Amino acid sequence: MAYSTVQRVALASGLVLAVSLLLPKAFLSRGKRPEPPPGPEGKLDRFPPMMHHHSAPSDGQTPGARFQRSHLAEAFAKAKGAGGGAGGGGSGRGLMGQIIPIYGFGIFLYILYILFKLSKGKTAEDRNCSTAPPGNAHRKITNFELVQLQEKLKETEEAMEKLINRVGPNGESRAQAVTSDQEKRLLHQLREITRVMKEGKFIDTSPEKEAEEAPYMEDWEGYPEETYPIYDLSDGIKRRQETILVDYPDLKEPSAEEIAEQMGEIEEEGSERLSWDHLPTDPGAQKDNSVAPCDPKPESCSCCVHEEEDPAVLAENAGFSADGYSEQEEATKENLPQDFTNEGLGVSTDNAHVGGMLRKRNPQGFE
Protein backbone atom coordinates (compact mmCIF):
# COMPACT_ATOMS: atom_id res chain seq x y z
CA MET A 1 0.00 0.00 0.00
CA ALA A 2 1.55 3.27 -1.15
CA TYR A 3 1.45 6.16 1.31
CA SER A 4 1.36 9.79 0.26
CA THR A 5 3.85 12.36 1.53
CA VAL A 6 1.44 13.82 4.08
CA GLN A 7 0.63 10.38 5.49
CA ARG A 8 4.31 9.54 5.86
CA VAL A 9 5.06 12.79 7.71
CA ALA A 10 2.11 12.25 10.07
CA LEU A 11 3.18 8.67 10.83
CA ALA A 12 6.78 9.67 11.58
CA SER A 13 5.69 12.53 13.83
CA GLY A 14 3.36 10.23 15.78
CA LEU A 15 6.12 7.70 16.38
CA VAL A 16 8.56 10.37 17.60
CA LEU A 17 5.95 11.79 19.97
CA ALA A 18 5.16 8.39 21.42
CA VAL A 19 8.84 7.59 21.96
CA SER A 20 9.55 10.97 23.57
CA LEU A 21 6.71 10.54 26.05
CA LEU A 22 7.21 6.88 26.92
CA LEU A 23 11.01 6.65 27.24
CA PRO A 24 11.42 9.14 30.16
CA LYS A 25 8.81 7.28 32.18
CA ALA A 26 10.56 3.98 31.57
CA PHE A 27 13.92 5.41 32.69
CA LEU A 28 12.45 7.03 35.83
CA SER A 29 10.68 3.83 36.86
CA ARG A 30 13.99 1.90 36.62
CA GLY A 31 15.90 4.44 38.73
CA LYS A 32 13.48 4.21 41.69
CA ARG A 33 13.99 1.45 44.31
CA PRO A 34 11.05 -0.28 45.94
CA GLU A 35 10.61 0.81 49.59
CA PRO A 36 9.36 -1.66 52.29
CA PRO A 37 5.85 -1.00 53.52
CA PRO A 38 5.75 0.83 56.87
CA GLY A 39 4.85 -1.27 59.91
CA PRO A 40 3.97 -0.53 63.57
CA GLU A 41 6.68 0.94 65.76
CA GLY A 42 6.35 -1.77 68.42
CA LYS A 43 7.36 -4.52 66.06
CA LEU A 44 10.90 -5.73 65.73
CA ASP A 45 10.76 -6.02 61.99
CA ARG A 46 12.04 -2.43 61.68
CA PHE A 47 15.34 -3.25 63.20
CA PRO A 48 18.14 -5.06 61.46
CA PRO A 49 18.51 -8.78 62.02
CA MET A 50 21.45 -8.15 64.34
CA MET A 51 19.11 -6.58 66.81
CA HIS A 52 17.05 -9.74 67.08
CA HIS A 53 20.01 -11.71 68.23
CA HIS A 54 20.82 -9.18 70.95
CA SER A 55 17.28 -9.12 72.28
CA ALA A 56 16.64 -11.13 75.41
CA PRO A 57 14.27 -14.00 75.13
CA SER A 58 12.67 -13.18 78.43
CA ASP A 59 9.48 -11.22 78.64
CA GLY A 60 10.85 -8.66 81.01
CA GLN A 61 12.26 -5.35 79.70
CA THR A 62 15.59 -4.04 80.94
CA PRO A 63 16.69 -0.31 80.83
CA GLY A 64 19.41 -1.12 78.25
CA ALA A 65 16.88 -2.49 75.87
CA ARG A 66 14.71 0.61 76.09
CA PHE A 67 17.70 2.86 75.31
CA GLN A 68 18.55 0.84 72.27
CA ARG A 69 15.01 1.10 70.95
CA SER A 70 14.90 4.90 71.32
CA HIS A 71 18.23 5.25 69.60
CA LEU A 72 17.11 3.12 66.71
CA ALA A 73 13.89 5.13 66.37
CA GLU A 74 15.83 8.38 66.03
CA ALA A 75 18.16 6.86 63.46
CA PHE A 76 15.21 5.55 61.50
CA ALA A 77 13.57 9.02 61.57
CA LYS A 78 16.73 10.62 60.23
CA ALA A 79 17.04 8.02 57.52
CA LYS A 80 13.40 8.55 56.60
CA GLY A 81 13.93 12.33 56.34
CA ALA A 82 16.93 11.81 54.10
CA GLY A 83 14.94 9.47 51.90
CA GLY A 84 12.18 12.09 51.53
CA GLY A 85 14.69 14.69 50.35
CA ALA A 86 16.10 12.32 47.80
CA GLY A 87 12.58 11.59 46.52
CA GLY A 88 11.91 15.33 45.99
CA GLY A 89 15.03 15.67 43.87
CA GLY A 90 13.98 12.71 41.75
CA SER A 91 10.58 14.30 41.01
CA GLY A 92 12.29 17.49 39.75
CA ARG A 93 14.52 15.50 37.46
CA GLY A 94 11.50 13.60 36.09
CA LEU A 95 9.70 16.87 35.11
CA MET A 96 12.72 18.10 33.18
CA GLY A 97 12.97 14.72 31.49
CA GLN A 98 9.37 15.10 30.22
CA ILE A 99 9.75 18.68 28.94
CA ILE A 100 13.00 18.19 27.02
CA PRO A 101 11.69 15.39 24.68
CA ILE A 102 8.60 17.44 23.80
CA TYR A 103 10.80 20.40 22.90
CA GLY A 104 12.99 18.16 20.75
CA PHE A 105 9.90 16.73 19.03
CA GLY A 106 8.78 20.26 18.10
CA ILE A 107 12.15 20.98 16.54
CA PHE A 108 11.94 17.74 14.63
CA LEU A 109 8.48 18.62 13.23
CA TYR A 110 9.75 22.03 12.09
CA ILE A 111 12.59 20.38 10.17
CA LEU A 112 10.15 17.99 8.54
CA TYR A 113 7.90 20.90 7.50
CA ILE A 114 10.80 22.67 5.77
CA LEU A 115 11.77 19.51 3.93
CA PHE A 116 8.15 18.96 2.85
CA LYS A 117 7.92 22.49 1.44
CA LEU A 118 11.08 22.05 -0.58
CA SER A 119 9.95 18.71 -2.00
CA LYS A 120 6.51 20.12 -2.90
CA GLY A 121 8.02 23.01 -4.87
CA LYS A 122 10.16 20.64 -6.89
CA THR A 123 7.24 18.35 -7.73
CA ALA A 124 5.11 21.33 -8.93
CA GLU A 125 7.88 22.45 -11.29
CA ASP A 126 8.27 18.93 -12.61
CA ARG A 127 4.53 18.72 -13.31
CA ASN A 128 4.53 21.98 -15.23
CA CYS A 129 7.44 20.89 -17.38
CA SER A 130 6.11 17.43 -18.06
CA THR A 131 3.62 16.85 -20.88
CA ALA A 132 0.03 15.85 -20.29
CA PRO A 133 -0.55 12.10 -20.06
CA PRO A 134 -2.49 10.41 -22.87
CA GLY A 135 -5.37 9.57 -20.54
CA ASN A 136 -6.35 13.26 -20.20
CA ALA A 137 -7.06 13.54 -23.92
CA HIS A 138 -10.21 11.45 -23.53
CA ARG A 139 -11.46 13.21 -20.41
CA LYS A 140 -15.12 14.11 -20.11
CA ILE A 141 -16.30 17.56 -21.18
CA THR A 142 -18.33 19.53 -18.66
CA ASN A 143 -21.67 21.11 -19.51
CA PHE A 144 -20.20 24.62 -19.45
CA GLU A 145 -17.49 23.67 -21.94
CA LEU A 146 -20.08 21.98 -24.11
CA VAL A 147 -22.22 25.14 -24.20
CA GLN A 148 -19.17 27.21 -25.14
CA LEU A 149 -18.29 24.81 -27.94
CA GLN A 150 -21.83 24.95 -29.29
CA GLU A 151 -21.82 28.75 -29.24
CA LYS A 152 -18.50 28.82 -31.10
CA LEU A 153 -19.89 26.37 -33.63
CA LYS A 154 -22.94 28.56 -34.26
CA GLU A 155 -20.79 31.67 -34.64
CA THR A 156 -18.55 29.88 -37.12
CA GLU A 157 -21.53 28.66 -39.14
CA GLU A 158 -22.99 32.17 -39.29
CA ALA A 159 -19.65 33.57 -40.42
CA MET A 160 -19.43 30.92 -43.15
CA GLU A 161 -22.97 31.70 -44.36
CA LYS A 162 -22.19 35.41 -44.53
CA LEU A 163 -19.00 34.65 -46.40
CA ILE A 164 -20.80 32.47 -48.94
CA ASN A 165 -23.54 35.07 -49.44
CA ARG A 166 -20.97 37.79 -50.05
CA VAL A 167 -18.89 35.82 -52.51
CA GLY A 168 -21.75 34.27 -54.53
CA PRO A 169 -21.41 31.82 -57.45
CA ASN A 170 -20.48 34.48 -60.05
CA GLY A 171 -17.64 35.88 -57.97
CA GLU A 172 -18.58 39.53 -58.61
CA SER A 173 -18.00 40.76 -55.07
CA ARG A 174 -14.78 38.89 -54.32
CA ALA A 175 -12.93 42.16 -53.74
CA GLN A 176 -15.16 42.97 -50.77
CA ALA A 177 -15.16 39.44 -49.35
CA VAL A 178 -12.92 38.06 -46.62
CA THR A 179 -9.45 36.88 -47.60
CA SER A 180 -8.62 33.24 -48.17
CA ASP A 181 -6.58 33.06 -44.94
CA GLN A 182 -9.61 33.91 -42.87
CA GLU A 183 -11.65 31.34 -44.77
CA LYS A 184 -9.10 28.63 -44.01
CA ARG A 185 -8.98 29.65 -40.36
CA LEU A 186 -12.75 29.48 -40.03
CA LEU A 187 -12.83 26.08 -41.69
CA HIS A 188 -10.10 24.82 -39.38
CA GLN A 189 -11.95 26.05 -36.29
CA LEU A 190 -15.16 24.43 -37.46
CA ARG A 191 -13.45 21.09 -38.01
CA GLU A 192 -11.71 21.19 -34.63
CA ILE A 193 -14.94 21.94 -32.78
CA THR A 194 -16.78 19.19 -34.62
CA ARG A 195 -14.00 16.69 -33.91
CA VAL A 196 -13.90 17.50 -30.19
CA MET A 197 -17.65 17.19 -29.86
CA LYS A 198 -17.65 13.87 -31.70
CA GLU A 199 -14.87 12.51 -29.47
CA GLY A 200 -16.86 13.47 -26.38
CA LYS A 201 -19.82 11.58 -27.87
CA PHE A 202 -22.20 14.43 -27.23
CA ILE A 203 -23.39 14.52 -30.84
CA ASP A 204 -24.97 11.52 -32.52
CA THR A 205 -24.13 11.82 -36.19
CA SER A 206 -27.11 11.39 -38.48
CA PRO A 207 -27.54 11.68 -42.26
CA GLU A 208 -29.34 15.00 -41.85
CA LYS A 209 -26.49 16.53 -39.84
CA GLU A 210 -23.91 15.17 -42.24
CA ALA A 211 -25.83 16.75 -45.10
CA GLU A 212 -25.87 20.06 -43.23
CA GLU A 213 -22.13 19.90 -42.65
CA ALA A 214 -21.33 18.81 -46.20
CA PRO A 215 -21.69 22.26 -47.91
CA TYR A 216 -19.02 23.77 -45.67
CA MET A 217 -16.14 21.66 -47.00
CA GLU A 218 -13.27 22.94 -49.12
CA ASP A 219 -14.46 21.39 -52.38
CA TRP A 220 -17.87 23.05 -52.17
CA GLU A 221 -18.32 25.63 -54.94
CA GLY A 222 -21.56 27.25 -53.80
CA TYR A 223 -25.21 26.87 -54.55
CA PRO A 224 -26.25 26.42 -58.20
CA GLU A 225 -27.85 29.32 -60.00
CA GLU A 226 -31.24 27.57 -60.10
CA THR A 227 -31.58 27.54 -56.33
CA TYR A 228 -29.70 30.74 -55.57
CA PRO A 229 -30.15 33.23 -58.46
CA ILE A 230 -28.55 36.65 -58.53
CA TYR A 231 -30.47 39.45 -60.20
CA ASP A 232 -28.68 42.39 -61.76
CA LEU A 233 -30.81 45.43 -61.01
CA SER A 234 -28.83 47.73 -63.31
CA ASP A 235 -29.99 45.87 -66.44
CA GLY A 236 -33.56 45.96 -65.22
CA ILE A 237 -33.43 49.73 -64.79
CA LYS A 238 -31.94 50.29 -68.25
CA ARG A 239 -34.28 47.91 -70.05
CA ARG A 240 -37.59 48.99 -68.65
CA GLN A 241 -40.52 47.25 -70.27
CA GLU A 242 -43.40 49.20 -71.73
CA THR A 243 -46.51 49.45 -69.62
CA ILE A 244 -49.60 47.87 -71.15
CA LEU A 245 -53.00 49.25 -70.19
CA VAL A 246 -55.48 46.48 -70.79
CA ASP A 247 -58.76 48.24 -69.99
CA TYR A 248 -57.75 51.62 -71.37
CA PRO A 249 -58.91 52.41 -74.98
CA ASP A 250 -56.59 53.55 -77.73
CA LEU A 251 -56.15 57.31 -77.80
CA LYS A 252 -56.10 57.44 -81.61
CA GLU A 253 -59.44 55.70 -81.99
CA PRO A 254 -62.53 57.96 -81.60
CA SER A 255 -65.02 57.18 -78.90
CA ALA A 256 -68.67 56.27 -79.47
CA GLU A 257 -69.82 59.83 -78.70
CA GLU A 258 -67.41 61.30 -81.23
CA ILE A 259 -68.61 58.83 -83.85
CA ALA A 260 -72.24 59.80 -83.14
CA GLU A 261 -71.43 63.51 -83.45
CA GLN A 262 -69.64 62.91 -86.75
CA MET A 263 -72.61 60.93 -88.10
CA GLY A 264 -75.00 63.71 -87.00
CA GLU A 265 -72.92 66.31 -88.85
CA ILE A 266 -72.84 64.11 -91.95
CA GLU A 267 -76.63 63.72 -91.92
CA GLU A 268 -77.15 67.46 -91.51
CA GLU A 269 -74.83 68.22 -94.42
CA GLY A 270 -76.55 65.56 -96.55
CA SER A 271 -80.01 66.96 -95.78
CA GLU A 272 -78.90 70.48 -96.69
CA ARG A 273 -77.39 69.26 -99.97
CA LEU A 274 -80.54 67.36 -100.88
CA SER A 275 -82.77 70.35 -100.11
CA TRP A 276 -80.72 72.46 -102.50
CA ASP A 277 -80.84 69.74 -105.15
CA HIS A 278 -84.68 69.51 -105.07
CA LEU A 279 -85.30 73.23 -105.60
CA PRO A 280 -87.44 73.90 -108.85
CA THR A 281 -85.02 75.56 -111.29
CA ASP A 282 -87.00 74.72 -114.54
CA PRO A 283 -90.62 73.66 -115.16
CA GLY A 284 -89.47 70.70 -117.25
CA ALA A 285 -87.05 69.71 -114.63
CA GLN A 286 -89.74 70.19 -111.97
CA LYS A 287 -92.00 67.82 -113.86
CA ASP A 288 -89.25 65.32 -114.25
CA ASN A 289 -88.45 65.63 -110.60
CA SER A 290 -92.09 65.21 -109.70
CA VAL A 291 -92.29 62.09 -111.88
CA ALA A 292 -89.02 60.66 -110.51
CA PRO A 293 -89.37 58.51 -107.40
CA CYS A 294 -88.55 60.42 -104.28
CA ASP A 295 -86.95 58.87 -101.28
CA PRO A 296 -88.94 59.68 -98.16
CA LYS A 297 -86.00 59.12 -95.89
CA PRO A 298 -84.63 62.70 -95.95
CA GLU A 299 -88.04 64.02 -94.86
CA SER A 300 -88.18 61.54 -92.03
CA CYS A 301 -84.61 62.42 -91.06
CA SER A 302 -85.36 66.16 -90.99
CA CYS A 303 -88.46 65.64 -88.89
CA CYS A 304 -87.20 63.04 -86.47
CA VAL A 305 -83.77 64.38 -85.62
CA HIS A 306 -84.54 64.53 -81.92
CA GLU A 307 -85.88 61.01 -81.83
CA GLU A 308 -82.72 59.46 -83.31
CA GLU A 309 -80.10 60.70 -80.87
CA ASP A 310 -78.88 57.19 -80.03
CA PRO A 311 -75.29 56.67 -81.40
CA ALA A 312 -76.01 53.14 -82.60
CA VAL A 313 -79.19 54.23 -84.43
CA LEU A 314 -77.38 57.16 -86.00
CA ALA A 315 -74.59 54.88 -87.23
CA GLU A 316 -77.11 52.52 -88.86
CA ASN A 317 -79.07 55.39 -90.41
CA ALA A 318 -75.85 56.85 -91.79
CA GLY A 319 -75.15 53.65 -93.67
CA PHE A 320 -78.66 53.50 -95.13
CA SER A 321 -78.68 57.21 -96.02
CA ALA A 322 -75.41 56.90 -97.92
CA ASP A 323 -76.86 54.09 -100.04
CA GLY A 324 -80.04 56.10 -100.64
CA TYR A 325 -78.09 59.16 -101.69
CA SER A 326 -76.10 57.22 -104.26
CA GLU A 327 -79.26 55.67 -105.78
CA GLN A 328 -81.05 59.02 -105.90
CA GLU A 329 -78.10 60.66 -107.64
CA GLU A 330 -78.04 58.00 -110.34
CA ALA A 331 -81.79 58.35 -110.92
CA THR A 332 -81.60 62.14 -111.31
CA LYS A 333 -78.75 61.83 -113.78
CA GLU A 334 -80.75 59.51 -115.98
CA ASN A 335 -83.91 61.64 -115.93
CA LEU A 336 -82.30 65.02 -116.51
CA PRO A 337 -81.52 66.08 -120.15
CA GLN A 338 -78.04 66.63 -121.40
CA ASP A 339 -78.21 70.38 -121.67
CA PHE A 340 -79.53 70.75 -118.17
CA THR A 341 -76.65 68.72 -116.93
CA ASN A 342 -74.30 70.98 -118.83
CA GLU A 343 -75.97 74.11 -117.55
CA GLY A 344 -76.22 72.89 -114.01
CA LEU A 345 -72.68 71.57 -113.89
CA GLY A 346 -72.05 73.15 -110.57
CA VAL A 347 -74.98 71.38 -108.99
CA SER A 348 -74.01 67.98 -110.38
CA THR A 349 -70.46 68.43 -109.27
CA ASP A 350 -71.69 69.39 -105.87
CA ASN A 351 -73.82 66.27 -105.74
CA ALA A 352 -70.86 64.18 -106.80
CA HIS A 353 -68.76 65.89 -104.19
CA VAL A 354 -71.35 65.14 -101.54
CA GLY A 355 -71.47 61.51 -102.59
CA GLY A 356 -67.69 61.30 -102.49
CA MET A 357 -67.64 62.77 -99.05
CA LEU A 358 -70.19 60.25 -97.94
CA ARG A 359 -68.19 57.41 -99.40
CA LYS A 360 -64.96 58.62 -97.82
CA ARG A 361 -66.30 59.30 -94.36
CA ASN A 362 -68.50 56.29 -94.22
CA PRO A 363 -65.72 53.82 -93.26
CA GLN A 364 -64.55 56.05 -90.41
CA GLY A 365 -67.98 55.98 -88.94
CA PHE A 366 -68.13 52.21 -89.01
CA GLU A 367 -64.69 51.93 -87.55
Swiss-Prot record:
Ranges of Basic residues composition bias in the record: 358-367
Record has Acetylation as a keyword: yes
Segments on the Lumenal side according to the record's topology features: 32-95
Domain description: The coiled-coil domain mediates transient homodimerization with other acetylcholine receptor-bound RIC3 molecules, promoting stepwise ACHR homomeric assembly at the membrane.
Bilayer topology term: Single-pass membrane protein
Signal peptide start and end residues: 1-31
Expression tissues: Expressed in brain, with highest levels in hippocampus, cerebellum and superior colliculus.
Bias (Basic and acidic residues) ranges: 271-280
Record cross-link Glycyl lysine isopeptide (Lys-Gly) (interchain with G-Cter in ubiquitin), residues: K201
Xref: InterPro entries: Ric3, RIC3_N
GO biological process, alphabetically ordered: positive regulation of cytosolic calcium ion concentration; positive regulation of protein localization to cell surface; protein-containing complex assembly; synaptic transmission, cholinergic
Keyword annotations: Acetylation, Chaperone, Coiled coil, Endoplasmic reticulum, Isopeptide bond, Membrane, Signal, Transmembrane, Transmembrane helix, Ubl conjugation
Taxonomic placement: Eukaryota, Metazoa, Chordata, Craniata, Vertebrata
Any one GO MF annotation of this record: protein folding chaperone
PANTHER family linked: PROTEIN RIC-3, RESISTANCE TO INHIBITORS OF CHOLINESTERASE PROTEIN 3 RIC3
General function of this protein: Molecular chaperone which promotes the proper subunit assembly and surface trafficking of alpha-7 (CHRNA7) nicotinic acetylcholine receptor. Promotes the proper subunit assembly and cell surface expression of alpha-8 (CHRNA8) nicotinic acetylcholine receptor. May also promote functional expression of homomeric serotoninergic 5-HT3 receptors, and of heteromeric acetylcholine receptors alpha-3/beta-2, alpha-3/beta-4, alpha-4/beta-2 and alpha-4/beta-4.
Gene Ontology CC annotations of this record: endoplasmic reticulum; endoplasmic reticulum membrane; membrane; synapse
Protein's name according to its UniProt entry: Protein RIC-3
PTM sites of type N6-acetyllysine: K201
Annotated spans, Disordered: 30-67, 262-301, 322-367
Stretches that traverse the bilayer: 96-116
Organism annotation: Mus musculus
